[in-house]
Amino acid sequence: MNDWTIEDARAGYNVTHWSQGFYGIGEAGEVTVSPDPLNPSNKVALDTLAQDLVQAGIALPVLVRFPQILHHRVESLCDAFNQAIQKYEYQNDYLLVYPIKVNQQKTVVEEILASQVSKEVPQLGLEAGSKPELMAVLAMAQKASSVIVCNGYKDKEYVRLALIGEKLGHKVYIVLEKMSELKMVLEEARELGVTPRLGLRTRLAFQGKGKWQASGGEKSKFGLSAAQVLKVVDELKEANMLESLQLLHFHLGSQIANIRDIRQGVSEAGRFYCELRQLGASINCFDVGGGLAVDYDGTRSQSNNSMNYGLTEYANNIVNVLTDLCNEYEQPMPRIISESGRHLTAHHAVLITDVIGTEAYMPENIQAPAEDAPQLLHNMWQSWTEISGRHDQRAIIEIYHDSQSDIAEAHSLFAVGQLSLMDRAWAEQTNLRVCHEVKGLLSNNNRYHRPVIDELNEKLADKLFVNFSLFQSLPDAWGIDQVFPVLPLTCLDKAPERRAVMLDITCDSDGIVDQYVDGQGIETTLPVPAWDPANPYLIGFFMVGAYQEILGDMHNLFGDTNSAVVFVEDNGKARIESTLDGDTVADVLRYVNLDADEFMHTYEELVEQHIVEDERASILEELQLGLKGYTYLEDF
């Protein structure tokens, strides 16, 4: 593969498509970040940035945030809707509401809000789904439009806090998720002397396709049926409060890959809106919820990890459907609201870490078995000589299948004591040699060979032991088989001579990344440059900005990683705005109610009992440093 080029690397890892222009591969084979896709020359190499962070005392793994990407995502989504509104002569506006559940980190929320600071009329609000989230947005929403959407199940305290938000100058929409909430809201509103802004979440009959499709449809956890919606209208009429009903909300589910699903859902919900208006409801906001997908694998397809549409098509479909429906029913066009958290945050964060070790299969020379060796070993030797000598007429794949059958029999014979350990080791090495040889003779252009190639890629893949916890940093990769782009940050100017799998440092066999973006598809192994300990490369896990931090758990007590907020200046230099230390060992012990100070007293007692006096001080110092240390590996 001497003709390998950077374009081959870009295509092989499909960077151009999943990155949306925010990340790329430079001519020297380095992965770069460019927060403004319209100015691609303004970029920074991630490996260089990682070195700068390490020199500043920030150990790997480190989660790097690029706020400029957040700004760009907000602007691009608002622009898409603004252009669609102009195109279809829609008689209202658009508001982007950020659901903070996607990423509640202070920096993330503040930077999303900061993207609208210069706007005369901000197009940004916040959504809360719990009391803690509501308390946060009550203190932050005034930095944008002061619009707050309250979703989720509610108790009296939640409702009162939302109503107090109105007294604080916010425009708070309390979305009714179940019938019992209506009475509670009206009672608390009367007590506080507040006119509530009510919303309805309706259950659509239509259900979008995807991993989160249970969020929509008639059996959804949230929302009101058609009959319940009408009952709410009747009760509001009786209370002379129908004018308080101002928002209609529905949700098809997160990561809707097919634009037709979105169009169909908007069409059904749009008829709810128009008919409720005909019944006298004063609804003036149409909240399409989430669903705007992110193209994790870059295939622009209907797969669960992709999307078959872009921002322009998304906005055009929603605006077009609502325009036609409102004209058909002769009803005013409502303000369009979307809750597009994944779209805003996914790209902005990258986890950068190091490889702590590797395990690779390298072919070894093997000798013919002794004449008195079990017949099985002679059969395996025959397969090896036939495939290596290229003089057998049998199909390559047939020989491969024979070898797999033989190695399975060898393991069975060893288990019942009919094959020695030395014989088993010889059989395994011979089988690996056959596999290695077969792989070199197969062709991707032959469709009959492809399943075997995939099998061999997995069987012969190198293992890269990577300094991170899958459960902490990529929980969706483990929990729902979400695909995240991953690739080495340097050495991509060299042809990928090996294929590998990434394993984390937890004591759990599930701690393995088992799906990788590879060209225009998903594979179980990743093509990588050959590992050179003298010139190691770092690993980057991309598009981890949505949900991963807040969903991450502390399996094996691996805690939050270090993090950094980085801006790329106009001169192409990285400016490290701020850093935040990850969890120490003492921190994670406290999470599970273990007292580090108490442990230290115990260590002192044990040292007093078991360690000679000259060593006590140094031993205690190491134990104390251990409690203060990073939960991830630092010296290896």
UniProtKB/Swiss-Prot annotation:
Key word Cell inner membrane present: no
Disulfide bond positions: none
PANTHER family per UniProt: ARGININE DECARBOXYLASE (PTHR43295), BIOSYNTHETIC ARGININE DECARBOXYLASE (PTHR43295:SF9)
Family (UniProt): Belongs to the Orn/Lys/Arg decarboxylase class-II family. SpeA subfamily.
Keyword Iron-sulfur: no
Name by which UniProt lists this protein: Biosynthetic arginine decarboxylase
Superkingdom of origin organism: Bacteria
Catalytic activity of the protein: L-arginine + H(+) = agmatine + CO2
Summary of the function given for this chain in its UniProt record: Catalyzes the biosynthesis of agmatine from arginine.
Cofactor: Mg(2+); pyridoxal 5'-phosphate
HAMAP family with a match to the protein in the record: SpeA (MF_01417)
EC nos: 4.1.1.19
Organism of origin: Shewanella denitrificans (strain OS217 / ATCC BAA-1090 / DSM 15013)
Pathway where it operates: Amine and polyamine biosynthesis; agmatine biosynthesis; agmatine from L-arginine: step 1/1
Pfam families cross-referenced by the UniProt entry: Arg_decarb_HB (PF17810), Arg_decarbox_C (PF17944), Orn_Arg_deC_N (PF02784)
GO molecular function, one term: metal ion binding
Gene: speA
Residues with the N6-(pyridoxal phosphate)lysine modification: K101
Residues annotated to bind substrate: F286, D287, V288, G289, G290, G291, L292, A293, V294, D295, Y296
Gene Ontology process terms (BP): arginine catabolic process; putrescine biosynthetic process from arginine; spermidine biosynthetic process
Keyword tags: Decarboxylase, Lyase, Magnesium, Metal-binding, Polyamine biosynthesis, Pyridoxal phosphate, Spermidine biosynthesis
